[in-house]
Amino acid sequence: MTDLHTDVERYLRYLSVERQLSPITLLNYQRQLEAIINFASENGLQSWQQCDAAMVRNFAVRSRRKGLGAASLALRLSALRSFFDWLVSQNELKANPAKGVSAPKAPRHLPKNIDVDDMNRLLDIDINDPLAVRDRAMLEVMYGAGLRLSELVGLDIKHLDLESGEVWVMGKGSKERRLPIGRNAVAWIEHWLDLRDLFGSEDDALFLSKLGKRISARNVQKRFAEWGIKQGLNNHVHPHKLRHSFATHMLESSGDLRGVQELLGHANLSTTQIYTHLDFQHLASVYDAAHPRAKRGK
């Protein structure tokens, strides 16, 4: 293992132990940093002390030429800047060579969501076995509270307060949130808890796989996609789309951007503001359908 790999391994341990980042986030960091390790090795670097701003810029250019999108490149450079900042804090580097290197601005894509009618159809699944009950409970909780996938699979039974209809989740940056989940979600969690012991696990996890272990993020993605097809939804159903749908429907109903920010666990309001564009799309479609002067130019 080279010094390049050794430093990255140390950094990943720091993120896991000190920062307590989720396994999914750690895997993303690892993938981004493996790309720069490969590039640095190809260019003859033996240690990060040999890396300079020119090399980081060349790395960014090469990544773009290989088809990496602007948003993905921004993520890669962000991971690299964080890594170099850590090396500076460890007195391994004097300065961060990635500090002044920026990715081209990514086009702003509005997140896709599921409309209310389709969401009701998705949730109205045929409950014919314990795993279907579990899936219904997961769908209700994710849509009812707008959870991230990592927050859903990380739920333990001790995080529930069913009497008050709330859950505690650990979000990004180890920030805890206490969230309402609604009556339907509470009812389906209770239904699932009645069946959960059939899997014979002593695991603390709320949602279990058929093997009695904490359900994996990949398994949740697979099951949600399968239910989307079974329920006849035209668009691919994935967990983050339920989070987008929660945010969109909450904003359409309440108009309370700050409240939605708190529920989603966004550190910055600007992250939540993208949903105001979705809300405007909804209002514009209502206007075009209903207002007598909407059909302009005719």
Swiss-Prot record:
A Pfam family the protein falls into: Phage_integrase
Subcellular location: Cytoplasm
Keywords: Cell cycle, Cell division, Chromosome partition, Cytoplasm, DNA integration, DNA recombination, DNA-binding
Residue ranges of domain Tyr recombinase in the record: 109-288
Assigned GO CC terms: cytoplasm
Cystine pairings recorded for this chain: none
Catalytic residues as annotated in Swiss-Prot or TrEMBL: 148, 172, 240, 243, 266, 275 (o-(3'-phospho-dna)-tyrosine intermediate)
PROSITE patterns with a match to the protein in the record: CB (PS51900), TYR_RECOMBINASE (PS51898)
Regulation of protein activity: FtsK may regulate the catalytic switch between XerC and XerD in the heterotetrameric complex during the two steps of the recombination process.
InterPro entries for the chain: CB, DNA_brk_join_enz, Integrase-like_cat_sf, Integrase_catalytic, Integrase_recombinase_N, Integrase_SAM-like_N, Recomb_XerC, Tyrosine_recombinase_XerC/XerD
Its biological purpose: Site-specific tyrosine recombinase, which acts by catalyzing the cutting and rejoining of the recombining DNA molecules. Binds cooperatively to specific DNA consensus sequences that are separated from XerD binding sites by a short central region, forming the heterotetrameric XerC-XerD complex that recombines DNA substrates. The complex is essential to convert dimers of the bacterial chromosome into monomers to permit their segregation at cell division. It also contributes to the segregational stability of plasmids. In the complex XerC specifically exchanges the top DNA strands.
Protein name in the entry: Tyrosine recombinase XerC
Organism listed in the record: Shigella dysenteriae serotype 1 (strain Sd197)
